[in-house]
């Protein structure tokens, strides 16, 4: 299964936010083992922020306090080019899905951070919006009727 997500840096709160492609809200911030991406305090997030979002199509782990499970997020743009040809990242992700030996979670996190922060901070891109693919997750899909709160759904 794969869910297409937008990834956007919120400079006001210094967090990385995710949302389903096509949704109007900025989604929830990534937290947990991604390192320098802090989770906002409850008072920093309006109670109704993202309440209109439909969560269909996203795996349960997308709403875990530790963030999505092992595969994390992979830049769709990078997967479509030869940038990752030496590691053939889509094949690596597929191997992880099957439980075979592949890149460690730490390596995948480093790859993700490089995709995002190198482009945004070093190259100075003005449009801080990328499309990412969350793939290979074995968790069941979230099936909750909209409206629901994107930040508090489990």
From Swiss-Prot:
Region: Mitochondrial targeting sequence, residue numbers: 68-117
PTM statement from Swiss-Prot or TrEMBL: A fraction may be phosphorylated in insect cells and HepG2 cells, a human hepatoblastoma cell line. Phosphorylated in vitro by host protein kinase C or mitogen-activated protein kinase. N-acetylated in insect cells.
Any one GO biological process: viral genome replication
Localization terms from the record: Host cytoplasm; Host nucleus; Host mitochondrion
Primary residence: host cell
GO cellular component term of the entry, any: host cell nucleus
Keyword Transcription listed: yes
Record's keyword terms, sorted: Activation of host NF-kappa-B by virus, Activator, Apoptosis, Host cytoplasm, Host G2/M cell cycle arrest by virus, Host mitochondrion, Host nucleus, Host-virus interaction, Modulation of host cell cycle by virus, Transcription, Transcription regulation
Keyword Glycosyltransferase: no
Reported function: Multifunctional protein that plays a role in silencing host antiviral defenses and promoting viral transcription. Does not seem to be essential for HBV infection. May be directly involved in development of cirrhosis and liver cancer (hepatocellular carcinoma). Most of cytosolic activities involve modulation of cytosolic calcium. The effect on apoptosis is controversial depending on the cell types in which the studies have been conducted. May induce apoptosis by localizing in mitochondria and causing loss of mitochondrial membrane potential.
Family classification: Belongs to the orthohepadnavirus protein X family.
Quaternary structure and interacting proteins, as annotated: May form homodimer. May interact with host CEBPA, CFLAR, CREB1, DDB1, E4F1, HBXIP, HSPD1/HSP60, NFKBIA, POLR2E and SMAD4. Interacts with host SMC5-SMC6 complex and induces its degradation. Interacts with host TRPC4AP; leading to prevent ubiquitination of TRPC4AP. Interacts with host PLSCR1; this interaction promotes ubiquitination and degradation of HBx and impairs HBx-mediated cell proliferation.
Protein name: Protein X
Protein source organism: Hepatitis B virus genotype C (isolate Vietnam/3270/2000) (HBV-C)
Lineage, uppermost ranks: Viruses, Riboviria, Pararnavirae, Artverviricota, Revtraviricetes
Gene responsible for this protein: X
């Amino acid at each position: 299964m794969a869910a297409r997500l937008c990834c956007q840096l919120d400079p006001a709160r210094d967090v990385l936010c995710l949302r389903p492609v096509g949704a109007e809200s900025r989604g929830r911030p990534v937290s947990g083992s991604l390192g320098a991406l802090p989770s906002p305090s409850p008072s920093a997030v309006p109670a109704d922020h993202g309440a209109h979002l439909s969560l269909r199509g996203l795996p349960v782990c997308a709403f875990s306090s530790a963030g999505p499970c092992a595969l994390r997020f992979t830049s769709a743009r990078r997967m479509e080019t030869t940038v990752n040809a030496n590691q053939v990242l889509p094949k690596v992700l597929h191997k992880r899905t099957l439980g075979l030996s592949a890149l460690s979670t730490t390596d995948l996190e480093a790859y993700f951070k490089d995709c995002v922060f190198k482009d945004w901070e070093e190259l100075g891109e003005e449009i801080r919006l990328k499309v990412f693919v969350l793939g290979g997750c074995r968790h069941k899909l979230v099936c909750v009727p909209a409206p629901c709160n994107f930040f508090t759904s489990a």
